């Protein structure tokens, strides 16, 4: 590359006013350039293009976000029609069901005395306080009620999740939105939470009655396989890391990799973790195409996701 290739576009100074929209702010981030502003600018650009040009669009996120008010935004995103499949963790099901049933989560703080909280029967999730009775038991009761009502000896996880979503009346429910739009919610670690524990104990109860029950997890994988192999282009918005991130990029490697990938994360790559791995590492595994477009934004999703999604909506609805 020549010297001129490095000095094409100058940084611009900006001003803001109370009349600025989020779209205006994104444009100003693009002018600011340094440092995370440039990443937000690119994320909006890449995600907007990916949603427009792809016929298979993944939304992946971790459960902790569902314990916050971001749950409503995630439900809105599922209901928007811009995503074809959700990949997440069992905690998402737990928090969404619990809150949809009217059980409150409360504003707390990180520095709370955890011993006192434990004695008071209060769970702490970061700076969110959850009364013990508001979390596990109501989730397990509903899941078992749905299983009994269905009366099936075998069910796919995504089908069961839809059945639960069908019975929730909360407009802020992710599972309700997924059922309405028929967006499959894939939870590869479905036994890792109250929702999955309820399935296990239901199965054990049936065994005592001499009956069998099978959770057909491979049906979810078959569904993903069919979606990936029937697609022409794929895009993913990945919020957080862990199994929900890996399951998206894992399946896309079998079709040559994602065409578009946007990561929102707080994890770093120096420890070699999957959560911290950047899109460029995914290229070496065939999980992102070498010519694919990608962006990584470091920061708290409760701050970044509303800004990025508002910027994306402004772009895709304008196009």
From Swiss-Prot:
Active-site residues, as the UniProt record annotates them? 287
Presence of keyword NAD: yes
Q: Which Pfam families match?
A: DS (PF01916)
In which domain of life is the source organism classified? Archaea
Q: Name one GO molecular function term.
A: deoxyhypusine synthase activity
**Organismal lineage:** Archaea, Thermoproteota, Thermoprotei, Desulfurococcales, Desulfurococcaceae
| Family named by the database record | Belongs to the deoxyhypusine synthase family.
Task: Enumerate the catalysed reactions.
Answer: [eIF5A protein]-L-lysine + spermidine = [eIF5A protein]-deoxyhypusine + propane-1,3-diamine
EC no. given is 2.5.1.46
Cellular component aspect of the GO annotation: cytoplasm
Q: Which gene encodes it?
A: dys
Q: Its annotated pathway?
A: Protein modification; eIF5A hypusination
Q: To which species is this protein native?
A: Ignicoccus hospitalis (strain KIN4/I / DSM 18386 / JCM 14125)
Name what cofactor the protein needs.
NAD(+)
Tell me the protein's name. Answer: Probable deoxyhypusine synthase
Keywords carried by this UniProt record: Hypusine biosynthesis, NAD, Transferase
Q: EC class of this enzyme? A: transferase
- Task of the protein: Catalyzes the NAD-dependent oxidative cleavage of spermidine and the subsequent transfer of the butylamine moiety of spermidine to the epsilon-amino group of a specific lysine residue of the eIF-5A precursor protein to form the intermediate deoxyhypusine residue.
């Amino acid at each position: 590359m020549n010297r001129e290739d490095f000095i094409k576009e100058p940084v611009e100074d900006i001003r803001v006013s109370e009349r600025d929209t989020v779209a205006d702010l994104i444009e100003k981030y693009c002018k600011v350039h340094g440092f995370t502003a440039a990443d937000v600018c690119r994320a909006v650009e890449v995600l907007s293009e990916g949603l427009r040009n792809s016929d298979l669009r993944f939304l992946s996120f971790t459960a902790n976000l569902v314990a916050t008010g971001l749950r409503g935004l995630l439900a809105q995103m599922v209901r928007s029609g811009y995503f074809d499949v959700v990949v997440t963790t069992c905690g998402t099901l737990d928090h969404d069901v619990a809150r949809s049933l009217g059980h409150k989560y409360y504003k707390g703080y990180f520095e709370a005395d955890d011993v006192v909280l434990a004695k008071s029967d209060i769970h702490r999730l970061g700076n969110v306080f959850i009364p013990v009775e508001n979390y596990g038991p109501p989730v397990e009761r509903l899941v078992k009620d749905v299983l009994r009502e269905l009366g099936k000896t075998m069910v796919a996880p995504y089908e069961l999740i839809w059945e639960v979503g069908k019975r929730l009346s909360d407009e802020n429910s992710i599972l309700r939105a997924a059922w309405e739009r028929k967006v499959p919610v894939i939870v590869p670690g479905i036994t890792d939470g109250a929702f999955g524990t309820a399935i296990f104990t239901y199965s054990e109860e049936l065994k005592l009655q001499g009956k069998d029950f099978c959770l057909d997890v491979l049906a979810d994988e078959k569904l993903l396989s069919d979606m990936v192999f029937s697609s022409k282009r794929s895009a993913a918005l990945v919020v957080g890391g862990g199994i929900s991130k890996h399951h998206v990029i894992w399946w896309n490697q079998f079709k040559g990799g994602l065409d578009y990938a946007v990561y929102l994360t707080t994890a770093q790559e120096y420890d070699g973790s999957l959560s911290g791995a950047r899109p460029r590492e995914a290229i070496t595994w065939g999980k992102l195409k070498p010519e694919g477009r990608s962006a990584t934004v470091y920061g708290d999703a409760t701050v970044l996701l509303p800004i990025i999604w508002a910027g994306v909506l402004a772009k895709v609805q304008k196009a």
